[in-house]
């Protein structure tokens, strides 16, 4: 089973027809979807054949119930605390595809309840860095990581966002990852550049670092600095990049654990990510 810890929130995706006209109207297409990096990974995993579980906190409100229901319908084992107000993120998509995020995470970072029994049948625990930088969720996530490690689970960390890394502090973040010692560390090219990894070495403390570089080849670096580059197949008719990195994780992680083949796992990750790129928001197209 693949388990994730973190945020389950609403994404309000706004496709702008032009640069915003401040003080007046701008024609747009607006769509509401389930979001949150941890929830996305769990859902994409379930929809593509991997048993998955999501652990987090949502509000005790209609939106929280709706979001949980959408995960359950996808086949995810949903384990949440329902208390407070569910968060939302507004994603502004410019005509050139550039995205801007307006973030209100609500109670997503308020999770403090730890139920170690939820790790009993977990083979992979995936934790976005969003879950490691704000209390009490950060301490809760670390306790789950320790519980999973004690049972032999593979630990995966995603860098999540350059803004998250900068706000937390690069040196502090690298020290945190060093202390966790994850088997897999996932990041994109911008995050890798900020962390100073990729050119000669992977993320300190991680057994395997995987750097996704958009349409360019994906780079994998082992702890002993062995490099592997995998070409990314071009994707036609890209609609939206929201959730593509989460889809990659949902494909890469179970395949890597099952096969121990980095190239095969990267190809699987990109195959699922391509389905998200062709669909609006963090959703899969029809395979």
Where in the sequence are the language-model features?
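Conserved phosphate-binding/catalytic region of the ribokinase-like
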Residues: 1-3, 26, 147, 196-287
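Ribokinase/PfkB-type carbohydrate-kinase core domain
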Residues: 1-8, 69-81, 93-228
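Short, glycine/acidic-enriched loop or turn micro-motifs at the edges of active sites
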Residues: 9-10, 14, 60, 161, ...
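Short, basic and Ser/Thr-rich N-terminal targeting/leader segments
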Residues: 48, 84-87
């Amino acid at each position: 089973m693949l388990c994730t810890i973190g945020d389950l929130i609403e994404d309000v995706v706004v496709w702008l027809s032009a640069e915003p006209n401040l003080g007046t109207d701008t024609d747009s297409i607006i769509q509401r979807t389930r979001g949150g990096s941890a929830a996305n990974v769990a859902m994409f995993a379930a929809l593509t054949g991997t048993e998955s579980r999501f652990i987090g906190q949502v509000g005790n409100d209609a939106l929280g119930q709706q979001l949980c229901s959408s995960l359950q319908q996808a086949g995810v084992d949903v384990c949440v605390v329902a208390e407070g107000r569910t968060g939302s993120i507004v994603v502004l998509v410019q005509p050139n595809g550039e995205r801007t995020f307006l973030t209100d995470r609500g109670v997503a970072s308020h999770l403090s309840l730890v139920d170690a029994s939820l790790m009993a049948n977990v083979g992979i625990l995936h934790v976005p860095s969003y879950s490691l930088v704000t209390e009490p969720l950060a301490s809760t996530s670390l306790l789950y990581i320790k519980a999973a490690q004690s049972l032999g689970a593979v630990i995966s960390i995603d860098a999540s966002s350059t803004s998250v890394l900068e706000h937390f502090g690069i040196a502090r973040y690298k020290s945190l990852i060093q202390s966790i010692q994850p088997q897999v560390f996932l990041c994109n090219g911008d995050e890798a550049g900020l962390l100073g990894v990729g050119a000669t070495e992977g993320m300190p403390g991680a057994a395997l670092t995987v750097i996704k570089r958009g349409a360019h080849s994906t780079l994998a670096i082992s702890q002993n600095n062995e490099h592997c580059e995998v070409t990314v197949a071009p994707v036609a008719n890209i609609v939206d990049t929201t959730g593509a990195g989460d889809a990659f994780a949902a494909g890469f992680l179970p395949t890597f654990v099952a096969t121990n083949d980095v190239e095969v796992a990267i190809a699987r990750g990109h195959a699922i990510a391509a389905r998200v790129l062709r669909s609006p928001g963090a959703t899969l197209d029809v395979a």
